[in-house]
Amino acid sequence: MKNINWKEEIIDFLKTLLVSFLVIFLFTKFIAKPVRVNQNSMYPTVLDQSVGITNIFSVEVLHDINRFDIVVVQTDDGKNLIKRVVGLPNDTISFKNDVLYVNGLPMEQPFLDEAYVNEEKAKYGLFTNDIEEITLGPDEIYCLGDNRPYSKDSREYGPFRESQVIGKGIFLLYPFNRFGGVE
């Protein structure tokens, strides 16, 4: 029978634990952060109570934010919101009769679920209330939830500063039937 050196075993275990914590810390500090959805504002794209991770590397290092990206923004009161970017710095945006206008040009929104939009239009007449023309500043973005009738977004909070974006995109881990990246 082999004699177990408990001191070495404990030291090996503590080393493994320390390395694991270090890897997790570095991963969540520089690459991706966990996110949990506590709202229906992105339905049906992302369901309430979904859990995933968001890419912070693209935002922190590459400063890569594009129109129609899904982002995680932090409000001034510290809430994290998952929204879609519809307006970029210096854009002029508006909504009229459910049409998004960017710099005066109508924009398609292919990411919206057409059946769901039509269902909500039948209930409320519009899916997205009209938004008066707004011109964004050099570091501002305008974000909306995909579930426009139920979303608290830039229409309520105003434009977000690019520095308020803490992650780009979401890779869903739960629910398991939606496992994978979200567009």
Model-derived regions: residue spans:
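Hydrophobic membrane-insertion alpha-helices, especially the h-region
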Residues: 14-30
